């Protein structure tokens, strides 16, 4: 098997968005984290990354974060050079899935808004990246808690 190299990474996390080399935001203010019982990610300005306002408005928070990281990783690559999009998630869009199922029960399976269902599927992040850049290549999402990252790496190596 040929050697495989990770060329770029991007992340959105509580300590700041370090994928943007020239403008990292660092959230080390004690005021910000002291009033919350949990850590909260320092999210980038999505307008700079996802230009389409309608698309951005319809995305859930987790989908925006995933798409932003994916687009940062792709950088200036042309869509023709991309051989595939492989995403991995531990729990996927669990909040959106819960929202959709609660709406399903509350409305007795009638008059459902399709947006929560569309956003609840685990392949939404990879699909949005492909749609934004018109990529018609291999697209796979792995969802299996701790094994999803390893599975995605093995898939990329094959």
Predicted regions and their residues:
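Beta-rich nucleic-acid/ligand-interaction surfaces
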Residues: 147-153
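Short, surface-exposed recognition loops or helix-turn segments adjacent to catalytic cores
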Residues: 139-147
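Conserved "HGTGT" condensation-loop signature of ketosynthase/thiolase-family condensing enzymes
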Residues: 1-138, 150, 158
